[in-house]
Structure formats: C-alpha cells, structure tokens
C-alpha cells in the first residue's frame, strides 16, 4: 500500500499525466490518494459571504481557523466537490476508485 498526497494546486489542474502515473502505481500496489483543496475552500467560503480566518503559530505555520460553519463548508468542498471530481477522473481512466 502506498499513500500519495496531491496538493490543492495539483487538484486545480489535474494533468492527464498525473492520472496516468497514479494508474500505473495502482496497478502495482494499492493506493491511498490524499488531496488538498484549501484555495477552493477559501473561494467557496467567500462566495457564501463568510470571511476566511487564519491563525499563525509561533513558528510561523499558517492554519485555517475552523469554526462550525467553516467546518461544514470545508466538508462540502473537500468531500462533495473536489473528492468527487478526482474519483470521476480516476474512474474515467479505468482506475478503481472510491471517495471517502
């Protein structure tokens, strides 16, 4: 089993070569694909009229401040929009995929 992490910027422009590479790996061993999508979460949050909030740790790491409403938006975007689009692309390319 191998885990592959693709960032939100890759998700935004998922190239056919990336799908092909994932397919090749999946044919050899099981794959868990983890995706980002923070920019899309921010975009949808703003479209819904809510201002995104972020916090910065003492070491300089920026993180999204997630209240209940933001958590619901995050879930909607990540598992509803992004996850489903990735699964659809993988399945169109004969990769057996399910989104969780």
Task: Give the positions of each predicted feature.
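Nucleotide/pyrophosphate-binding catalytic subdomain
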Residues: 1-100
């Amino acid at each position: 089993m191998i885990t592959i992490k693709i960032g939100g910027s890759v998700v935004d422009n998922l190239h056919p070569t990336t799908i092909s590479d994932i397919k090749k790996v999946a044919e050899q061993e099981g794959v868990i694909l983890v995706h980002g999508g923070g920019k899309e979460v921010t975009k949808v949050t703003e479209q819904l009229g809510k201002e995104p909030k972020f916090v910065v740790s003492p070491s300089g790491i920026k993180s999204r401040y997630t209240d209940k409403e933001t958590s619901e938006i995050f879930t909607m975007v990540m598992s509803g929009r992004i996850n489903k689009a990735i699964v659809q692309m993988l399945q169109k390319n004969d990769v057996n995929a399910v989104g969780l």
